[in-house]
Regions:
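Conserved TIR/SEFIR loop-to-helix hotspot centered on a Trp-containing motif
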Residues: 81-129, 149
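Short, glycine/charged-enriched secondary-structure capping and boundary segments
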Residues: 27-30, 88-91, 152-155
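C-terminal interaction surface of TIR/SEFIR-family domains
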Residues: 2-7, 11, 141-189
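A short helix->loop->beta-strand "cap" motif at the edges of active sites that frequently abuts
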Residues: 129-137
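Conserved N-terminal substructure of TIR/SEFIR domains
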Residues: 1-73, 77-79, 181, 185-189
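Hydrophobic/aromatic beta-strand patches that form the interior of the parallel beta-sheet core
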Residues: 74, 136-140
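Solvent-exposed loop/turn segments at secondary-structure junctions
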Residues: 19, 80-82, 144-146
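Short C-terminal domain-edge/linker segments immediately following a structured domain
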Residues: 43-47, 71-74, 104-110, 169-174
Length: 189
């Protein structure tokens, strides 16, 4: 369905490192779709997808449209989330590097140069909406600990932060790590 058909903020926006933390993001989808779990959200990304051949700038326009329809921003933070570069203009085929004739970087498509990653861009939009009381922010760590140093700077000290995993000791005294549904459910609401 086209996003233009929606007018209210009714969706949840999921963000994160879709390669490094894909298992954690997939677990959120599993909990959301399973009948035995009480987690319930409507993922904006399930409504529309960008094509893989889209330019970074057009993907960011699409992300902005999606964000405007969301009431909650959930980001999964892993060890590399704050360092992601995907989406930065300098990673695009159409990026013009500065040279001796043009001291400023540019775009062969005449678009504005924005060297923020997709995640940085999403976090800054979410923080803006949070500051305007338009959005709740939930930061979930793909870990047993909440480590705000791993969180992208705009969201480091706002919203609800929770770990997605917990340490468990089995009946034999062996320790292992498992998903912490209760922590996630409490954070997302």
């Amino acid at each position: 369905m086209a996003l233009d058909n929606y007018t209210y903020r009714t969706f949840t926006y999921l963000a994160g490192d879709w390669t490094g933390d894909s298992a954690a993001i997939e677990m959120l989808h599993t909990w959301n779709s399973g009948h035995k779990w009480g987690l319930s959200f409507k993922d904006i990304h399930s409504e529309t997808q960008s094509s893989d051949d889209s330019h970074n700038c057009s993907i960011k326009v699409s992300l902005r449209k999606r964000m405007k329809l969301c009431k909650k921003f959930v980001i999964v933070v892993g060890s590399e989330t704050a360092n992601l570069r995907s989406g930065a203009c300098y990673t695009c085929f159409w990026y013009k590097k500065p040279d001796m004739y043009n001291l400023m970087p540019g775009c062969y498509l005449n678009n504005h140069v924005d060297n923020r990653s997709y995640v940085q861009f999403e976090c800054e939009m979410a923080k803006h909406d949070y500051d305007n009381d338009d959005m709740d922010i939930v930061v979930l760590y793909n870990s047993v600990n909440v480590n705000r140093n791993l969180c992208p700077e705009p969201l480091r000290w706002v919203g609800t932060h929770a770990a997605m995993k917990k340490k468990v000791t089995d009946y034999l005294g062996n320790n292992h790590i498992e998903w912490d549904y209760d922590s996630v459910k409490k954070a997302i609401g």
